[in-house]
């Protein structure tokens, strides 16, 4: 009789050690802010979002939640040796500026700040305007 081994619950993560430079992708939407840190080739080192850090509902869209998410992602990335980063901003949410400030405060050297917000050339129909 052959015994089947039970699959492990947690998948073992591959450790990326000693990466001196990388790219920080900040996607700031009206509902959330997502911070991903990659090496120059595009492999993810760490990521965090306002929802992952523990905020829910309308608090996810705040600038403070973006600050906490950026600090969390930067702390994990600095453990793998990250020192200098380029920042790519995408979106028009409240967490754009505060995420960049949090990265600088965490001790990362920001060399370039690039704005890659997608602008439609009259593509999809926008959502309806709010009437308050």
From Swiss-Prot:
Quaternary organization: Part of the 30S ribosomal subunit. Interacts with proteins S7 and S18. Binds to IF-3.
Superkingdom, taxonomy of origin: Bacteria
Keyword rRNA-binding: yes
Membrane-spanning ranges: none
GO annotation (BP), single: translation
Family the entry assigns: Belongs to the universal ribosomal protein uS11 family.
Function: Located on the platform of the 30S subunit, it bridges several disparate RNA helices of the 16S rRNA. Forms part of the Shine-Dalgarno cleft in the 70S ribosome.
Classification lineage: Bacteria, Pseudomonadati, Chlamydiota, Chlamydiia, Chlamydiales
Molecular-function annotations in GO: rRNA binding; structural constituent of ribosome
Pfam entry (one): Ribosomal_S11
Disulfide feature: none
Record-linked SUPFAM superfamilies: Translational machinery components (SSF53137)
Record's keyword terms, sorted: Ribonucleoprotein, Ribosomal protein, RNA-binding, rRNA-binding
GO CC annotations, alphabetized: ribonucleoprotein complex; ribosome
Name the record gives this protein: Small ribosomal subunit protein uS11
Record organism: Chlamydia abortus (strain DSM 27085 / S26/3)
């Amino acid at each position: 009789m052959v015994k089947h081994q039970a699959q492990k619950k947690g998948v073992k993560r591959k450790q990326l050690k000693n990466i001196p430079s990388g790219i920080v992708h900040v996607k700031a939407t009206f509902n959330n802010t997502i911070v991903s840190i990659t090496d120059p080739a595009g492999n993810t080192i760490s990521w965090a979002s306002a929802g992952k850090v523990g905020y829910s509902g309308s608090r996810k869209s705040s600038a403070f939640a973006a600050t906490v998410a950026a600090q969390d992602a930067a702390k994990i990335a600095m453990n793998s040796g990250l020192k200098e980063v380029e920042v790519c901003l995408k979106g028009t949410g409240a967490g754009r500026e505060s995420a960049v400030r949090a990265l600088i405060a965490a001790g990362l050297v920001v060399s370039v700040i690039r704005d890659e917000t997608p602008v439609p050339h009259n593509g999809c129909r926008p959502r309806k305007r709010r009437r308050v």
